[in-house]
Amino acid sequence: MFYPDPFDVIIIGGGHAGTEAAMAAARMGQQTLLLTHNIDTLGQMSCNPAIGGIGKGHLVKEVDALGGLMAKAIDQAGIQFRILNASKGPAVRATRAQADRVRYRQAVRTALENQPNLMIFQQAVEDLIVENDRVVGAVTQMGLKFRAKAVVLTVGTFLDGKIHIGLDNYSGGRAGDPPSIPLSRRLRELPLRVGRLKTGTPPRIDARTIDFSVLAQQHGDNPMPVFSFMGNASLHPQQVPCYITHTNEKTHDVIRSNLDRSPMYAGVIEGVGPRYCPSIEDKVMRFADRNQHQIFLEPEGLTSNEIYPNGISTSLPFDVQMQIVRSMQGMENAKIVRPGYAIEYDFFDPRDLKPTLESKFIQGLFFAGQINGTTGYEEAAAQGLLAGLNAARLSADKEGWAPARSQAYLGVLVDDLCTLGTKEPYRMFTSRAEYRLMLREDNADLRLTEIGRELGLVDDERWARFNEKLENIERERQRLKSTWVTPSAEAAAEVNAHLTAPLSREASGEDLLRRPEMTYEKLTTLTPFAPALTDEQAAEQVEIQVKYEGYIARQQDEIEKQLRNENTLLPATLDYRQISGLSNEVIAKLNDHKPASIGQASRISGVTPAAISILLVWLKKQGMLRRSA
């Protein structure tokens, strides 16, 4: 039977991608249905109890700038906050928070259940309704059919998921959850390229069986960082430390002597694992010269006894896992409460997607999260928001939107996936972005909130706060530009005391702030330039904008040059065999990838600058050289 009411957008899956997709579509006023196999696991942290990190924290800030959920949820659930790379430049600084799993899940569920235009329904999805190459609905395991104008697939590791512990394996979406086998079979019937990937998780340890007294502590930062541009530290619950232990030669001997029982090394697992989050087996074999690896013991919550040992993800048999755990300092008597495991799952080639994350072959069908070959909560959340907003726009007969590489890490992520694809689980790093000085955590709202408002993602409260911040920045910069001190002035001695070289000429507040030894905090304690802004976010922006003004201007020039290529469009139906002068390799790659623009084409491996020049000349001769607005 059909459900009596139609929907504009259906989201299948309630993980980090699905919850952001559902919230985005509903915020934009579209009637949205979130289908999940279990309402109690909405927003579940399936692996590590943490949000953020290098590159990942940038994505969380961007999701937040567009009105998303993740940053607000972690501000309510974070039990340790730190700024990584704090001693480095602002482009690579990143926020990371340890999470209380239960609080995080509760924060997500509360937000979903209180979001207008959003309905949640508990049933696993087994089929899609596709008519004339357009998706028009979904079918649940009990045969209930839902109609919609757009469907977003955010199914994580559930598609034909297979869990491995040693040489034993069984079907599962993650530990304790069934896989989605009928939906996997249905998707394999569609004209989509499919592959297998693998990820893993470590065993969880009973905190009562660890001797923390012999371990080094790692505390959070004080003052505590905040993730959301709308948040403040008063939202954070009690803060707790993490602990550090290490593997040793005994640990490594245990692993090496049991590799024949590893499903990965025995050839049982076909899927490719994440390069930047390898299993402990991989680390020991790939870095054979290392006699130890650092392991972080991370609490899973304020009311939980479970400890997440970050760094020993494994699919070795349980008896070997026990030996590994007990070989480390402080863990000699440790007890495992959940075994580690690896999981294999289906993913679909993201090169078959438009930058909006809509399928090129099935109209109205969007993909987000691990189904696209990514790994990580943050990457999933960012894709979910993008897919959700574009599903909402499609259902309202509006054009899709995707950020450029120069606008957001989300733009880098989507362009990498849709242009290059991936053969291993993709994770975000700041090194993937060409314009990372422009794409900082601190200015995510300045880059994206106005766009979010135009798209209908940003509410009145966030918009008012954003405009107030803009006004504070502009007003303070004008004040510092127009406040001067001369070498002969009475205040000069006070100023000179904070400078490595005394004033030799008249200087404005901005002139002084450009000096490497001067900070905004220090400057605004000096008589001519007091008082400081009480808006800490605006104050941070003032300092960064002034200190890095020259570098930012140069990078902006580079972006404008690159935009000419990004905006030069390539016809979707173009057969590159008709263009003389291109090599067979280039023709094959262009016909395979079908890039949307000259910029995309230039990033495909093997497509040379000479080939790009030939393309541009051919387009001009054919009268097909056109640029997007």
Curated annotation (Swiss-Prot):
Keywords from the UniProt entry: Cytoplasm, FAD, Flavoprotein, NAD, tRNA processing
SUPFAM superfamilies in alphabetical order: FAD/NAD(P)-binding domain (SSF51905)
Binding site for FAD: G13, G14, G15, H16, A17, G18, V125, S180, Q370
Cofactor: FAD
Keyword match Cell cycle: no
One annotated GO molecular function: flavin adenine dinucleotide binding
Keyword Cell membrane among record annotations: no
GO biological process, alphabetically ordered: tRNA methylation; tRNA wobble uridine modification
Compartments where found: Cytoplasm
Binding site for NAD(+): 273-287
GO cellular component, one term: cytosol
Predominant location: cytoplasm
Binding partners and assembly: Homodimer. Heterotetramer of two MnmE and two MnmG subunits.
Family note: Belongs to the MnmG family.
Role of this protein: NAD-binding protein involved in the addition of a carboxymethylaminomethyl (cmnm) group at the wobble position (U34) of certain tRNAs, forming tRNA-cmnm(5)s(2)U34.
Stated name of the protein: tRNA uridine 5-carboxymethylaminomethyl modification enzyme MnmG
High-level lineage: Bacteria, Pseudomonadati, Pseudomonadota, Gammaproteobacteria, Enterobacterales
Gene of this entry: mnmG
